[in-house]
């Protein structure tokens, strides 16, 4: 499935919900070919848009969910977090997905009331690169300061002393670095730039952090798949991608120095989980980053993808369908996170449950489970 990333820019998710007034959604045990059969007479169509970061997992969810449920259809557009937030606020979709939480200013634009952030998965942002002289089995090592200087355009060649200092014995060519960054509003960019701002005063006082920034150098590409393609096809390029994209496209990726500078950590489900499990201070609205997390084995560039939903739903059928899909995704759906994403920690799942249970369909709770 991950090998199909570039072909699933727009994933159609056949979700299924047995429509009964008493229970909202009940499993039918039917396959996708019988999801609209006699036992499931009603159909609720939902639409979502946003994060490319989560798209490989969302596609996997679609396959599994349609096999176990029946009745509703959900389409998901992998357009980037920024575009997803825009569509969500314009109410042209029923839910959004973003890797950077909405800002206070964005939430203030909501014409449909309170917005809920529901963490759906956790992933790592890998530093992708294309340096032919470096063996594919080698993960080049980068400090946070070195990465900031590369993306600032201050380190210009691959054999720069700052890179060489962390990669003793590696054949680093005297070739110019081509930085590849996102051209669209991107939650993946949000995670990376929050990390760079945390480790570099030059970055925090310069480009800063956000889904869209003024990049000091480099070329832009749209979506995680666009950056992956650009890096793969450009010798001596460096970029950043959700881990699933570099693995699916056989792109080399680096190890990043951990917070206490005791080692260089390769992104994986284990090292991203270590970062996520180090989080103890969780705000009530679940809007936070955990970049540069403590822990010897914590990969420092990791973050959530959130589902965005409105707390007060005006269409009871859609509200129930959204709530039930969100519940499934944050519970049964977590088993499909491995190997390139991380299952949500129990403390986050508990907070997700409270968010979903707070959704109202008129005077009743949307979630009936």
Annotate the PLM regions.
Residues 22-27:
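C-terminal motif of bacterial Sec signal peptides marking the signal peptidase cleavage site
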Residues 9-19:
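Sec-dependent N-terminal signal peptides
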Residues 2-6, 11, 29-369:
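Flexible loop/hinge segments at secondary-structure junctions
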């Amino acid at each position: 499935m991950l090998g199909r990333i570039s072909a699933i820019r727009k994933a159609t998710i056949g979700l299924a919900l047995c429509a009964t007034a008493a229970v909202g959604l009940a499993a039918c045990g039917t396959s996708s070919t019988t999801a609209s059969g006699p036992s499931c007479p009603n159909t609720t169509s939902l639409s979502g848009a946003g994060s490319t970061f989560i798209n490989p997992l969302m596609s996997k969810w679609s396959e599994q969910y349609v096999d176990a449920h029946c009745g509703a259809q959900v389409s998901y557009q992998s357009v980037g977090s920024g575009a997803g937030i825009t569509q969500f606020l314009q109410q042209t979709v029923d839910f959004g997905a973003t890797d950077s939480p909405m800002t206070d200013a964005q939430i203030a634009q909501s014409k449909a009331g309170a917005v809920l952030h529901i963490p759906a998965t956790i992933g790592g942002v890998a530093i992708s690169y294309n340096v032919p002289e470096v063996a594919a089995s080698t993960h080049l090592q980068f400090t946070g300061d070195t990465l900031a200087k590369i993306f600032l355009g201050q380190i210009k060649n691959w054999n720069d002393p700052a890179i060489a200092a962390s990669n003793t014995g590696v054949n680093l060519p005297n070739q110019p670095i081509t930085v590849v960054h996102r051209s669209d509003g991107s939650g993946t960019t949000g995670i990376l730039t929050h990390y760079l701002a945390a480790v570099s005063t030059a970055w925090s006082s310069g480009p800063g952090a956000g889904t869209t920034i003024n990049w000091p150098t480099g070329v832009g590409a749209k979506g995680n798949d666009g950056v992956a393609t650009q890096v793969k096809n450009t010798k001596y390029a460096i970029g950043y991608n959700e881990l699933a994209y570099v693995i699916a496209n056989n792109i080399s990726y680096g190890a990043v120095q951990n917070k206490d500078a005791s080692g260089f950590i390769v992104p994986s489900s284990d090292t991203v989980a270590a970062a996520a499990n180090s989080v103890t201070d969780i705000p009530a609205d679940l809007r936070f980053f955990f970049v540069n997390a403590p822990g010897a084995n914590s990969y420092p560039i990791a973050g959530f993808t959130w589902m965005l939903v409105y707390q007060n739903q005006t269409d009871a059928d859609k509200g129930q369908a959204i709530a039930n899909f969100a519940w499934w995704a944050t519970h049964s759906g977590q088993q499909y996170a491995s190997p390139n994403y991380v299952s949500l920690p129990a403390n986050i799942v508990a907070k997700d449950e409270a968010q979903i249970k707070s959704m109202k369909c008129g005077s009743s709770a949307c979630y009936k489970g």
